[in-house]
């Protein structure tokens, strides 16, 4: 069962399964038009830049204080999605999330500062699916993912993420600190 975080500090084993970036948007700004054709690039490692995003990604330096400097998606959710639709030939990258990770309930990280492989993040919000999920994956994917389409986060320290096993360490539960104040 994936780690779920509820107001306490802890660490857990996780695994970074895949890393993706794209230099341009294929869906944002394309409503009512065909999607763009910018390739999704799978990486073995990626540079995280404080307050800016992933070096080379379309959202790098997108906007000041942007909540989606990096996006995470659970490998377990992707597996359920594939099983539900009977689709095995599409990679997790079609969902346009940056980091595919296993071993953690990502939505439990909303409001938390956490660290993976020495890089610190703040979980900001659910990365809600858009209509393009039905185009990129299969009709009905948006509805299937409406409650669990990933995590948006801010990057709080420079560093590099790489594929493989890692520790996810909760640095602080920001929402618990605010509600207890």
Predicted segments with their positions:
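Electropositive, beta-rich accessory/interaction domains or terminal extensions
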Residues: 2-116, 120, 125, 175-181
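Glycine-rich active-site loops that engage anionic ligands at enzyme catalytic sites
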Residues: 101-156
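Well-ordered alpha/beta subsegment
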Residues: 151-181
């Amino acid at each position: 069962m994936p780690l779920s975080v509820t107001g306490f500090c802890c660490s857990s084993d996780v695994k970074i399964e895949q890393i993706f970036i794209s230099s341009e948007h294929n869906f944002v700004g394309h409503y009512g038009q065909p999607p763009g054709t910018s390739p999704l690039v799978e990486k073995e490692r990626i540079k995280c830049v404080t307050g800016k995003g992933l070096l080379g990604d379309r959202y790098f330096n997108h906007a000041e204080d942007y909540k989606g400097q990096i996006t995470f998606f659970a490998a377990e959710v992707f597996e359920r999605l594939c099983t539900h639709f009977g689709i095995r030939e599409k990679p997790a990258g079609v969902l346009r999330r940056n980091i595919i990770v296993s071993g953690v309930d990502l939505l439990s990280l909303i409001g938390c500062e956490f660290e993976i492989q020495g890089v610190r993040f703040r979980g900001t919000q659910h990365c809600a699916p858009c209509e393009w999920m039905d185009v990129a994956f299969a009709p009905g994917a948006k509805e299937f993912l409406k409650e669990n389409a990933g995590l948006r986060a801010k990057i709080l320290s420079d560093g590099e993420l790489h594929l493989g096993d890692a520790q996810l360490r909760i640095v602080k539960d920001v929402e618990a600190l605010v509600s207890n104040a």
